[in-house]
A protein has these predicted regions:
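Non-catalytic, conserved peripheral segments adjacent to functional cores
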Residues: 1-106, 130-160
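Conserved metal-binding segment of the jelly-roll/cupin
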Residues: 102-124
Length: 160
């Protein structure tokens, strides 16, 4: 696996090694020791799976402390534009925005650490799976509007 830090501190794009032949493919999506060596030393305790029609925006979601969540995100069908915002007030990239294309064809994954808001737009019908470092907690649920004027995010679709 290849681990690449992106424009926001601690945001990591992961490119897995895919073994493909005429029968199909195999890849390892998570290995605690490999991730630890790649700079991601967390414990995932919940897996989620969502399905969205083309053009759907989900997010920007986050949970308040002490229920913050880190996430490992991948598109298992279709493609998404994944959008994250750094909400860590003491971070050098505070309020920074990153956009990453995740596609079921290239199988890249995105690690979003605790302290970020997360969302995505489905560029086609898609399924997205993500691992979380904390359980969902309804009382800690929060979010930022997708069209927040301060962030001014271009979701790269017509009529969001």
């Amino acid at each position: 696996m290849k681990f690449e830090e992106l424009n926001l501190k601690d945001l990591i794009l992961i490119t897995p090694q895919v073994f493909a032949d005429n029968r199909g493919f195999f890849l390892e999506t998570y290995n605690r020791e490999v991730f630890k060596k790649g700079g991601i030393d967390v414990e995932f305790i919940q897996d989620n799976h969502s399905c969205s029609s083309a053009g759907v925006i989900r997010g920007l979601h986050f949970q308040l402390a002490p229920y913050t969540q880190g996430k490992l995100i991948r598109a298992t069908q279709g493609s998404i534009l994944d959008v994250v915002v750094d909400l860590r007030k003491h971070s050098s990239t505070y309020k920074g925005v990153a956009k990453v294309l995740l596609d079921s064809k290239d199988k890249k994954m995105l690690y979003v650490p605790e302290g970020f808001a997360h969302g995505f737009v489905s560029l086609e019908s898609c399924e997205v799976q993500y691992k979380c470092t904390n359980l969902y907690n309804k009382s800690a649920e929060s979010g930022i509007r997708w069209d927040d004027p301060e962030l001014n995010i271009d979701w790269e679709i017509k009529n969001p």
